[in-house]
Amino acid sequence: MSSKEAEAQKGKQGWITPTVIPPEEWGSFRYRGKTLEELLNMPMDEFIKLLPARQRRSLKRGLKPEHRKLLEKIRKAKRLMAQGKKVTIKTHCRDMIILPEMVGLTIHVYNGITYIPVFISPWHIGHYLGEFALTTRIVQHGEPGLKATRSSLHIAAK
């Protein structure tokens, strides 16, 4: 195993994985009073009005070129998945806002070390992709004593 792969494995340890709600239970989903089907059929201008202010302002300014490229990848992947092919979508666009057309896909989001698979459910709509692929690990400190942490340097050695 190379050092880069070892780093990637270290990066995956300690991650909190959110519970995935199965698609059968998506019928109860509502976003600002709208069902998923209504959101999918809604024009982008109307959908933008439903978002919180930060996301609304970001989308009103228009998508960045890398976000447009990601949306093209997503649309292409959906076409291929309809034909029965398996497609992996990888991206570095952590600041992409999750749109209704992304629901049901697994997008691999880069966290600085490795790609973290994020299954997009309806409850993710309006959030950023980066919110679901944390960039830092949960720190698990060792026993207090010598060489543990800087704050425990003053514990007397036995």
Swiss-Prot record:
* Function description: Protein S19 forms a complex with S13 that binds strongly to the 16S ribosomal RNA.
Keywords on record: Ribonucleoprotein, Ribosomal protein, RNA-binding, rRNA-binding
- A GO molecular function for this record? rRNA binding
Family stated for the protein in its record: Belongs to the universal ribosomal protein uS19 family.
Extract the Gene3D superfamilies matched here.
30s Ribosomal Protein S19, Chain A (3.30.860.10)
One CC-aspect GO term: cytosolic small ribosomal subunit
Q: Does the keyword rRNA-binding apply?
A: yes
The protein's gene is named: rps19
**GO BP terms, alphabetized:** ribosomal small subunit assembly; translation
Matching PROSITE patterns, A to Z? RIBOSOMAL_S19
> What's the name of the protein?
Small ribosomal subunit protein uS19
